[in-house]
């Protein structure tokens, strides 16, 4: 695990296109803002270029301050295009139906966005389906716009596929109603268990007038190849490091038994395989926590108590003791030295 640093995540620089367009629609030039964060036009032209989630959140927050619009995330979603999601988005644009477009955006999400906290999902039942975005709590001025832009962006993108408006039956958002709550659709509920939008079967069944079967199949093959390349895992330790991300939350640390259950193998088998790789579950857990803690402290404004909660520590004090053991300095000292 020491050679495989755990990161918060990253996303395609294509997402900057909709952010810039939203800023421009408010009468502001986005170029100085993007240059301030190292996003020169030449960087945005690079195929496959990615942007760290922490930097994206800082840019989004700065854009909100620049425009004076706390609901800017909703506007970002409204101007979102499928092409901004790269190969996955272009493939979704060729899907035969809205349903298949939604499934494509979800299945191939790692091609344009990755976060250790989890992955988006699609849940269909007899009455319709939910497109669900994973939790990125705790919420603040730096990340609420991410939820806003993504859910609103999904609706915009699926409407493009259908060639007509695709409305959500219900919009559910995890964080409490913000000051700009009046800017959301009337059917929005806050303080919910998930970030998700509800689509009817009638909308999911809408056909894509631009669908070409052969092009669709070719693009799907390319997506599968790229997904396999991006998600290829060399060791069991790396696989466990990925699983720990979504499990590290809520003020409690995940156990070997929980991880073994996720892998669908007995705990003793997992322990034996890790020994064969020359590592232990506790070492992987500590390395994962250390890497994430360093990134949170360096790249975000989260309080140490919030970081402790996200990394499964029972208290801020327990987290600070562990961090000093790992890095020989306190979290406060680490943040100060990294920002000088």
Region spans (language model):
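N-terminal low-complexity or simple alpha-helical regulatory segments
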Residues: 1-128
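DNA-contacting interfaces and partner/effector-binding or oligomerization modules
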Residues: 117-206
């Amino acid at each position: 695990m020491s050679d495989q640093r755990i990161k918060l995540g990253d996303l395609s620089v294509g997402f900057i296109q909709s952010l810039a367009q939203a800023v421009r629609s408010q009468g502001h030039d986005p170029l100085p803002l993007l240059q301030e964060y190292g996003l020169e036009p030449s960087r945005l032209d690079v195929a496959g270029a990615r942007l760290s989630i922490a930097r994206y959140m800082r840019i989004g927050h700065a854009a909100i301050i620049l425009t004076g619009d706390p609901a800017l995330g909703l506007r970002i979603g409204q101007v979102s295009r499928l092409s901004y999601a790269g190969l996955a988005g272009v493939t979704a644009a060729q899907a035969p139906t809205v349903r298949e477009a939604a499934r494509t955006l979800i299945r191939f999400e790692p091609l344009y966005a990755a976060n250790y906290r989890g992955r988006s999902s699609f849940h269909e039942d007899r009455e319709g389906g939910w497109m669900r975005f994973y939790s990125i709590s705790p919420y603040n001025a730096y990340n609420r716009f991410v939820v806003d832009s993504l859910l609103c962006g999904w609706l915009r993108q699926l409407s493009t596929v259908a060639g007509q408006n695709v409305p959500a039956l219900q919009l559910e958002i995890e964080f409490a109603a913000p000051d700009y709550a009046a800017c959301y659709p009337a059917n929005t509920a806050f303080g919910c268990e998930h970030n998700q939008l509800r689509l009817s079967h009638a909308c999911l069944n809408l056909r894509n007038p631009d669908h070409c079967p052969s092009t669709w199949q070719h693009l799907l093959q390319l997506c599968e190849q790229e997904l396999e390349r991006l998600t290829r895992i060399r060791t069991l330790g790396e696989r466990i490091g990925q699983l720990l991300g979504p499990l590290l939350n809520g003020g409690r640390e995940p156990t070997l038994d929980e991880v073994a259950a996720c892998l669908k193998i007995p705990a003793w088998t997992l322990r034996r395989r890790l020994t064969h790789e020359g590592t232990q579950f506790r070492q992987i857990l500590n390395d994962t926590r250390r890497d994430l803690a360093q990134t949170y402290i360096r790249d975000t404004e989260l309080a140490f108590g919030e970081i402790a909660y996200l990394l499964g520590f029972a208290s801020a004090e327990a987290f600070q003791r562990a961090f000093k053991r790992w890095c020989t300095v306190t979290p406060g000292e680490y943040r100060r030295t990294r920002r000088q």
